[in-house]
Amino acid sequence: MCIRDRLGSYRFQTFGEYSAVLSTFNIEARQIRGEFKGEPYTGIIYSATDDSGKVVSPPFKSSRFGKRFGNERLEKRMLSHTRDFKDGKWAPTIHAQVVYAMRHARSREELTGLLKKASIDAVFRENEQGRIYGVTFIDHNRREVFNGSRMGKEFSANIYNELFKWWDGIPATERSAHTGTELWQHHSHKAEPGSALEQAARIFSMETNPVDYGEEALARRMKKRRKAKRKSRGV
């Protein structure tokens, strides 16, 4: 389990995003909390997994790989990445590729396959009932990691939860007889106003009318910074 080589220079802002990128290399990272000499501490342990995410090795303490992979150094790294993100030094650039995959796929498997062709991994987190409550995208070309909600509400977990259920509800014979785009043309009008499926259908206009999500996100962050400065000056 060569974690030093795998992590490289990926940028992420939360431990969840960090563990998501490692999971694509069959590595599980878990935080452990406890108390030592009356003081609380947080540590990280790493394990190897198989392709289904099942742990197949004993856990290894972060100290085995060096301080860089311990909780203290990781917290500093995430803080630095978050600061740079807020300053507009990096931002998601994969919106168009994700939208293309959503529009042209006919199943969850096809969606992840199309993303992989663009060197993008999607990690979905599900509860015991199978409901998706989180999604993280890993852009391996730029080595950047984003929770779906950070890319925009159109890429949040709820969208994919409803999208996958919608795909599964279409008869297999119909799915195999049509492209993903044709399925949307045949069925998207049935989506209830304000539903997650309607939101998904709206973003498909990106293919003909691209939206610069990175520019929009930067504008929102700069607006927040200006408001914060005015508050600090008592304006």
Regions found by a protein language model. Give the residues of each.
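Extended intrinsically disordered terminal tails
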Residues: I3-V235
